[in-house]
Amino acid sequence: NVSRGLAQRLRALNRFIDDIYNRQKILAEDVVPAELVLTSPNFRAECVGMKPAQSAWANICGTDLVRDSAGHFFVLEDNLRVPSGVSYMIENREVTKRVLPELFYDHSILPVDDYPSRLFEMLASLAPRERKRPNIVVLTPGIYNSAYFEHAYLAREMGVELVEGGDLIVSEDNYVQMNTVDGPVRVDVIYRRINEEYLDPEVFEKDSLLSLIHISSPRDKHR
């Protein structure tokens, strides 16, 4: 029930975001005050009219759950921007299985070690062109980021490249490419671990050195 409820919640959040940046019906009907949304520093006017793949604005959500003394679950918050921490969960499970294996003998505990493969499948489903194995990259701010271990861990476990902004370029025909020793290679999907305000200095934070100029152009052209 918890799993189904969280999936339903994420679908609702995605539909809310899609409505905010497109029809804005929820604002017109005053379900949510328009002023509250449109004046929010987190509202991105650049995203108005966008249609992401499969209408999924948030493909990954880190929902914090708490349970009260009566055993009822409550959502503390939904981390939709750049959720972090899953690698520590996986590593913690591995350590627990080795140190306290008896905990797993008599309890039905769902596995978590398949997360990287499921993450890869989800990212691959978003590729704009059909390929047997889409070219996916994990975009990291770099080694000084507090979650860099996770960025490297997930890239390694998925078998994809870990890149920084300087490793990517936008071609003249508006495709994102990755610099390699053999020349530029087209990128199909970017799993970004960078807040959106640092993505493109021409569109968002002008002093950002973490990503690359024009990365928003392929997005605008649905590439």
Residue ranges of predicted features:
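ATP-dependent carboxylate activation and anion-phosphoryl transfer catalytic cores
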Residues: 1-211
